[in-house]
Regions:
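Sec-dependent N-terminal signal peptides
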Residues: 3-12
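Histidine-centered catalytic micro-motifs
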Residues: 173-180, 212-222
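N-terminal active-site segment of His-dependent metallophosphoesterases
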Residues: 14-77
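Active-site glycine-centered loops adjacent to acidic/histidine catalytic or metal-binding residues
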Residues: 27, 65-66, 98-99, 177, ...
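Structural motif
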Residues: 22-24, 62, 132-134, 173-175, ...
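Short acidic, glycine-rich surface-loop motifs adjacent to enzyme active sites
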Residues: 164-184
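Extended active-site neighborhood of metal-dependent phosphoesterases/phosphodiesterases
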Residues: 36, 73-171, 189-192, 196-208, ...
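Short active-site segment of divalent metal-dependent hydrolases/proteases
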Residues: 30, 68-69, 101, 180, ...
Length: 276
């Protein structure tokens, strides 16, 4: 403990900010294992993830979508919220909507239901020298049934990114459910990405405002790609994995030199995670 305090004091004395970390969970998706007949395995996985977060005590936990499997399912939502409430009150929890939370084609009704159960579907938050932008990627990618809501979110994002340019606000980091793309920014449309025409518009906006990191989920496996200076990281699931992946979560370290990250399977989580 004494050594840690000396290192921290030295870093502050030299004008450097100490490193810190947060945890990214994704796709706990209560109901997926048993196709909405139950969620015993999801309960076990999420209980373990929350207990581990309490042990590691990160700056915050963000859950990048698909909290539940069936949009509007009261039992799945209640179980997610019951376990999430076990997180240490000193650790902020940020929910992000996924397509299984608001529907593949969100409507005003599904958006209202999500907001009632889980809170706002897009918003910003601050953590040390980071400015988090939570986006509703389902609404971005499929706006047809809620066009006014989609337009409102897009206008809001532009305004908030402009505010974030002010000195002292912190580096912008985006959290959403769908990755913008899997391999290349101009790839063809598919289930796992954002439609190309919409994607191009938003990528231009993120580049315009100097965003360097987007953390997503949706794929139930780990994927990483980039568009110039913009890194797109899709994180594997707390819930059911696909494609040979394993359940786990990502540790993201934020320091003076930038951002680094590592995905840990549940069986490989170290006893402690000092800032790197």
């Amino acid at each position: 403990m004494r050594l840690f305090l000396l290192v921290l004091w030295a870093a502050l004395a030299c004008g450097a900010s100490p490193s810190w970390y947060f945890l990214q969970f994704s796709d706990p998706q209560f109901g997926m294992y048993e196709e909405n007949r139950g969620f015993v395995q999801e309960t076990a996985n999420f209980e373990y993830a929350i207990a581990t977060a309490n042990r590691l005590h990160p700056a915050f936990v963000v859950v990048t979508g698909d909290l539940i499997n069936q949009p509007g399912d009261a039992a799945e939502a209640a179980e997610y919220r019951r376990i999430a409430a076990k997180l240490d009150p000193g650790i902020p929890l940020y929910n992000v909507p996924g397509n299984h939370d608001v529907g593949n084609d969100p409507t005003p009704a599904t958006l209202a239901a999500y907001r009632q159960r889980f809170g706002p579907d897009y918003y910003t938050f601050r953590a040390a020298d980071l400015m988090g932008f939570v986006l509703n990627s389902s609404l971005i990618g499929h706006p047809a049934k809620a066009p006014e809501e989609a337009a409102r979110q897009e206008a809001w994002l532009g305004a908030e990114l402009e505010k974030a340019r002010r000195p002292g606000i912190g580096r912008p980091v985006v959290f959403q459910h769908h990755p913008w793309f899997l391999k290349a920014p101009d790839e063809a449309d598919e289930y796992s990405n954002i439609p190309k025409e919409i994607r191009a518009r938003y990528l231009a906006l993120l580049h315009q405002y100097g965003v360097r990191w987007v953390f997503a989920g949706h794929c139930h496996r780990n994927e990483q790609s980039s568009d110039g200076t913009l890194e797109i990281v899709a994180t594997g699931p707390v819930g059911k994995p696909l494609g040979g992946a394993r359940s786990g979560f990502r540790v993201v370290t934020v320091g003076p030199e930038g951002i680094s990250h590592h995905y840990y399977d549940f069986g490989d989580i170290p006893n402690r995670l000092p800032p790197q």
